[in-house]
Amino acid sequence: MKLKTTIAALILLSAAVVANAQTVEKKALTLDGAKKVIAGAVAYAKKNNAPGGVIAVVDDGGNLIALERMDGTFAAGANISIGKARTAALFKRPTKMFEDTIKNGRTALIALPDTFFTPLQGGIPIVIDGQIVGAVGVSGAASAQQDEEIAIAGANVLAADAKISALTTDEKRKP
């Protein structure tokens, strides 16, 4: 009886090891992280005299985490910024790439449903340690170029935090 119990335990243990080997560690964007992205984007917008802007932050699945609409921004900017962020997250690319592709004649892209695809400049993936954890989308600044610059500034806040955090961790390991 003891032998059967030992064998059963070994089988279960080996199954757990196999199951564990089939998973990967995935980074996730938190609400705190999304708020930092928005704060960085708003600070950049104010510093560069943007007339307004809506900043949306989504997770890697395109789900809204946080949104801020600066004073003076048109109401439709909220949905547009969410669409830009969602597009950047789901396609893992800046949305300017899609806008440029359409401008260059690939008009079939505009047939994609707008709930998943907003091919307008201003959506930027948020990358931490090589993993896309979400995206930021901006709409309502002075131009599409400024939308993108504000989004980049927001995304870079977390990238900078990750580098600082990694540096601090590495420094602690040194004897």
Cite the ranges covered by each PLM segment.
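Bacterial N-terminal signal peptides that target proteins for export
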Residues: 1-8
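N-terminal signal peptide c-region/cleavage motif recognized by signal peptidases
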Residues: 14-18
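Flexible, solvent-exposed loop/hinge segments and secondary-structure transition points
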Residues: 21-175
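Cleavable N-terminal signal peptides
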Residues: 8-9, 19
